[in-house]
Every structure is written in C-alpha cells, then in structure tokens.
C-alpha cells in the first residue's frame, strides 16, 4: 500500500512539472536566413507562423541586407546587416500576410512573405 501511495505522489509531481513546462513554453520562434548558399534570397521565402510568434532574420552571406515590410514600418529593420551571423527578431501581434524585401536586392528578387494566423 505504501509503495502505491509513493507511486501516485511521484506521478502527481511529474505531471505537475510537465504541465508547468507545457504552459511556460514561449511563443514559437522561426528563422529566416538572408543570403542563403551565396544567393540573394530569403530562405525560406514563405513562412507561416501564429500570432505572438517571433521570426529571427539572420544574415548568412553576401551583405549588406535589410528587411523592409510593406506597410509595416514598425516591423521593418532599415539598418543594413553587414556581418555574417548578425540577426534581429520580429514579433507578430496581428494576423495577416506580411510582405517583405531586402531593399538593396529587391530587384534581384530578394523578397518573401510571412503568413500570420
């Protein structure tokens, strides 16, 4: 009987820890690379995230890059990223489609879209 009581106490403790971790996990974070594999691209160039999620843009190669969101200056990162590994994060608080581009390389097709649900 005592073994059984100890088992249930341990299970209760484990389930409490798991529930705490489940609800304490921060919003999902995704990553988009700028200049992937030596190309003037965002990789991926299309991404779907949830409201409250963050996306980190990482300068991979071929600087300089920036990220400008059409109609959303508050999300844009106008400063040019020159160093490989340089990054910045954008958090999306409203659902919608967010088109973005690298201004220096938009003519080369360096554009993308983030769908926020």
Tell where the protein language model's regions lie, with residue ranges.
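Bacterial N-terminal signal peptides that target proteins for export
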Residues: 3-15
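Bacterial N-terminal signal peptides
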Residues: 15-24
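Extracytoplasmic copper-binding redox domains, predominantly the cupredoxin/blue-copper superfamily
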Residues: 25-117
